[in-house]
Amino acid sequence: ARVFRDRTLGVLDALVGATTLTFAALISSPERDEESLRLVVEVADTIGQEIAHCVREFVEQAPMLGDEERLGLLRDFYGRVGKTLDALGSTGIAAVVHEVVEALALCADVDPRAVFLQVARVVEHGRRGGYECDDLAKDAIVRLVQRYLADHRALLQDESACRAALISILDIFVRAGWAEARLLTYNLEQIFR
């Protein structure tokens, strides 16, 4: 089973690599081929949906496992797809960025610091595609920030990189006009209580 999984993840990495390179070439071309661009966006979106679906399905079935076993399997998964999620998120395609953020949020307990910094990078890339203007984005980011304020407060207190990432994420959504992001920003002093 491990060999099959490793081969599958290798194919996924190759597909994501080809997709992101093709997307970058199409987006920067002065004579943009809109049909090819649409197809590449569709492929990237499908990949993002499938990865997020796999993580959600695993988390839903995880209660049958012990905490250590569940966390170990999720850690293994994140270790294998973390860079793939970065590559997908770097496209800036709003729908793809959303799926990547959703998948990363489910991996937060594996490595809270790395996941949070990765979310911040992906959200920054998402600005190119208008991710911050999407209602689903707002809900996902508000949930994630609230979770980090509740479960990983010490990380935000002690790690300047994580605080900077938090401020960057909230700033993006405040500038987009989201009242929820503004409210979270006003309540940031609770991090230091």
What kind of region is each of these model predictions?
Residues A1-R193:
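Non-catalytic all-alpha helical scaffold/repeat segments
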